[in-house]
């Protein structure tokens, strides 16, 4: 890394949601969506791990819920899983609670009445049905349909 830094010039390129200002999917501003997620990522992780606007550029030509869902399932979710080491509670804080389902696990139900010293816990799973629903994306912004 040090040798590369001595030989080359590096310029910081932060996400630029402004290039998505004219992109909306079913009335939802993609620029606002990206900005909101990145503010949360900056607080929960750091600004160097914010999501780049390039992921959303295909929406300029094809601003559909199907394309947005594809971007989230193929790019955004795996990226957040990597950033947060599959800490789904933090991923839920970034995306709201529509995309990640929480299942409460009762240790007695799971293991019977054995004398097991376990606390009840929870497991997480991706709610793939949410990706096709524009309201799931609106929930990231904490707004209802008529407020976007």
Predicted regions and their residues:
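C-terminal regulatory/interaction module of P-loop NTP-utilizing enzymes
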Residues: 1-148
């Amino acid at each position: 890394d040090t040798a590369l830094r001595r030989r080359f010039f590096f310029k910081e390129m932060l996400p630029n949601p402004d290039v998505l200002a004219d992109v909306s999917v079913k009335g939802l501003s993609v620029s606002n969506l990206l900005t909101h997620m990145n503010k949360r990522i900056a607080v929960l992780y750091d600004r160097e791990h914010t999501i780049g606007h390039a992921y959303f550029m295909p929406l300029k030509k094809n601003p559909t819920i199907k394309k947005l869902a594809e971007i989230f399932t193929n790019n955004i979710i795996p990226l957040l899983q990597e950033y947060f080491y599959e800490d789904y509670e933090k991923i839920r804080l970034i995306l709201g609670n529509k995309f990640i389902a929480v299942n409460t696990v009762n240790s007695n139900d799971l293991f019977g009445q054995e004398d097991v010293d376990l606390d009840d816990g929870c497991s997480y799973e991706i709610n793939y049905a949410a990706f096709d629903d524009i309201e799931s994306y609106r929930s990231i912004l904490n707004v209802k349909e008529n407020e976007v």
